[in-house]
Amino acid sequence: MELALFSTSLTMGPRPYMPNPSGFGVKEYPLPPGTNITQMHMVHRHGSRYPTSSASVATFPDRVAELLGNGTRFTGDLAFLNSWEYQLGKEELTALGRQQLFDSGVLNWFNYGRLYDPSSPLIARTTTQVRMLQSAENFLNGFFGPNWTKNVTLKVLTEETGFKNPLAGDKACPNNDNDRSAAGDWASTQWQERYLKSATDRFRQSMTGNPNWTIEDTYNAQTMCPY
């Protein structure tokens, strides 16, 4: 990528969401003569959210507090960390995320609302994770309006090991949490050791006392940027 065209916000991985300028690779064509849409089934991802409780973003404040407790003091551009307070939420949708799902509901009503038959029971499904439940509720609010509970039954599926839940495949796959599925994590750690070495050295130059600042700390600090 040419430096003149470089955008930090486009190089942060999955967050924040940036639409593909060339679309999804699926071309839109009109329906063939004599055909019509009679049903619409949708699987929708949750909206923009705050970090999960176990994410490096959420654990970074505790690490800063640990360093300060061990006598480390931050200087220069990092001096703000001496009195910094973490103010992000955890797990739930951001205000933007709620708006995204509401807007999606409105758009889908205009596109497919004519298919809705009030005499036919309609069921929507989500899971017990806060952001999932909030996403479903905001989508249905956009689709049907504030009285959406009169139009659709929202089934909330338990997202825990041992429960049948097609919306949470990780709970049904025995390999999800073992080393067999962790190759990506290993590769990421190896890459961090390379590309963050110089940055870690620069961070240490802005610390006094007992700065046991690691490459992992630099990475965790970096993960806060999208938020």
How would you label these PLM feature ranges?
Residues M1-P121, V130-Y227:
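Signature for phosphate-centric chemistry
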Residues T127:
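Structured beta-strand/turn binding interfaces of compact recognition modules in eukaryotic regulators
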